[in-house]
């Protein structure tokens, strides 16, 4: 399961 590069909280 990969996340998007801009999936960081903020």
Curated annotation (Swiss-Prot):
Q: What is the lineage of its organism?
A: Eukaryota, Metazoa, Chordata, Tunicata, Ascidiacea
Q: Which family does the record assign? A: Belongs to the GnRH family.
A GO molecular function term, named singly, is: hormone activity
Keywords of this protein's UniProt record, alphabetized?
Amidation, Disulfide bond, Hormone, Pyrrolidone carboxylic acid, Secreted
What's the protein name? Gonadoliberin-2
Task: Report the residues modified as Glycine amide.
Answer: 10
Gene Ontology CC annotations of this record: extracellular region
Which purpose does this protein serve, as stated in its record?
A: Stimulates the secretion of gonadotropins; it stimulates the secretion of both luteinizing and follicle-stimulating hormones.
Q: In which tissues is it expressed?
A: GNRH neurons lie within blood sinuses close to the gonoducts and gonads in both juveniles and adults, implying that the neuropeptide is released into the bloodstream.
Subunit relationships: Homodimer; disulfide-linked.
> Which residues, renumbered to this chain, carry the PTM Pyrrolidone carboxylic acid?
1
Q: Where in the cell is it found?
A: Secreted
């Amino acid at each position: 399961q990969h996340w998007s590069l801009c999936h960081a909280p903020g």
